[in-house]
Amino acid sequence: MSFSPASSEPHDAPAAAGSSVPASRSIAERWKMEAAPIRARLLLRAFAWLFSLLALVVMATDVHGRGGAQDFSTYPEYNYCLGMSIIALLYATAQLVRDAHRLSSGRDLVAGRKAAAVVDFAGDQVVAYSLISGLSAAAPVTDYMRQATDNLFNDSAAAAISLAFFAFLAISLSALISGYNLSLEAIV
């Protein structure tokens, strides 16, 4: 039995008189809790990868007719949104590979825990802001065109923008977890 520095009660003592739950967690429970943010970030990055891929595919195939107003490549806003989706897809792919390697081997591809935390946080921030920038550039064009006519081209553009927004949400939530991990590294 060990004693807590803040109190004179032992760590293994029950939390309440009639309870059998220990006041502290076992090492295995702590390990599971420490790995929870890593697993959550991996899941969020997988969602970001999926939504970025879908946004890329939907926007790149948004060609209805032969050029002119029914082709996404004639609108620079859509090209920008497509470019940001490509960047998000590449980033999410790299981070998924890195996180999977980290979970499977226990070692990170980036040397140093603090450097890895900074890379995670900065990368998530840059990609999240890039995605929101791309979709906020494309959304007004789609809204304006949908007011004039509602067709498959506009619906596909709106779907691609929505998927890019979901990718943004996943990466921005991953940035919150990365920020939490960075703050823990700054304390240590």
UniProtKB/Swiss-Prot annotation:
Question: What does the UniProt entry say about where the protein is found?
Answer: Cell membrane
Cytoplasmic topological domain ranges are 1-42, 98-114, 178-188
Is-annotated flag, keyword rRNA processing?
Answer: no
For this chain, the family text in UniProt reads: Belongs to the Casparian strip membrane proteins (CASP) family.
Q: Which residues lie on this side of the membrane: Extracellular?
A: 64-76, 136-156
Q: What is this protein called?
A: CASP-like protein 4B3
Its placement in the membrane is given as:
Multi-pass membrane protein
Q: Which residues cross the membrane?
A: 43-63, 77-97, 115-135, 157-177
